[in-house]
A protein has these predicted regions:
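Iron-sulfur-associated redox domains of electron-transfer enzymes in respiratory
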Residues: 1-260
Length: 260
């Protein structure tokens, strides 16, 4: 829980793993005001918790358009591999926009020694595993009920993709208010607001459940297994990914020649 701007800055930035919220729950009370931000399933749990304790009025709940969350085991294995390379670290930033909003798929790590490391989407196995859906939690597939406009939050946020902002380098946020409390909170913020239809906002988001494909069934057992390390997982993934790219290329060539 943050109570100052300085503390808030420490958690600034996109995250691709869920936060451990147990200590946060322990500090909830009926005297202070809280803004809680988390994945849609986390926020649903918070809503149930505060509703049962009749302290909802003290809270503004915010979730976001969620692609899904990877297994914590995958993150732990990735972290261990990074520590072997650069030593201990306590600063990780996802989606750094130093090169612009549209080129923000990068991972930045600052080691305790002060050494700075970063990789882009093209070369980062964690990002590629994440976007292949192979590393997502099983609950994100057939049990997620928080896509599109399904939410227990007051406000949902995300990136505002689309042709209108294709040349914008700073980034544009989409904000959807589900409750009057959320609407009031957004109106009190000193920012520029431009209205869009819900369909326009949704068009740039993953609004359907991910599909369990061959990547998931072959890689997920390795991710879960304590005996498999990061290098073994990524080696298998790269081989599968290369095979898939080759198959796509062959199919596209066949499709081109079949039209002639």
């Amino acid at each position: 829980i943050c109570s100052t701007i300085e503390e808030l800055n420490q958690i600034f930035g996109s995250k691709y793993v869920q936060s451990n919220t147990i200590k946060g729950f322990e500090q909830f009370n009926n005297k202070d005001k809280f803004v809680v931000i988390g994945t849609p399933c986390q926020i649903d749990s918070v809503r149930r918790y505060i509703k049962k304790r009749k302290i909802e009025e003290n809270f503004v709940l915010i979730d976001f358009f969620c692609h899904g969350v990877p297994s914590m085991k995958l993150w732990n294995k990735f972290s261990a591999s990074q520590r072997n390379k650069i030593g201990n670290f306590n600063s990780v930033t996802w989606r750094n926009k130093v090169d612009g909003w549209h080129k923000s798929y990068r991972l930045d790590i600052i080691a305790d020694s002060g050494e700075y490391h970063h990789t882009g989407l093209k070369f980062d196995d964690f990002f590629n595993l994440y976007f292949s859906n192979a590393a997502l939690s099983p609950a994100c597939f057939d049990k997620c009920k928080y896509k599109q406009d399904q939410s227990s939050a007051d406000i949902r946020i995300g990136d505002m993709w689309g042709a209108d902002y294709s040349k914008n380098k700073e980034g544009v946020n989409s904000v959807i208010c589900f409750t009057e409390k959320g609407n009031k909170a957004v109106k009190e913020i000193d920012c520029t607001i431009k209205r869009h239809t819900f369909e326009e906002v949704l068009s740039g988001q993953m609004n359907f459940l991910p599909i369990r494909d061959n990547f998931f069934y072959r890689l997920n057992p390795l991710i879960i297994a304590d005996s498999e390390n990061w290098n073994e997982i990524t080696t298998r993934f790269r081989k599968m990914f290369l095979k898939k790219r080759i198959m796509r290329k062959v199919k596209s060539i066949i499709k081109i020649f079949s039209k002639k």
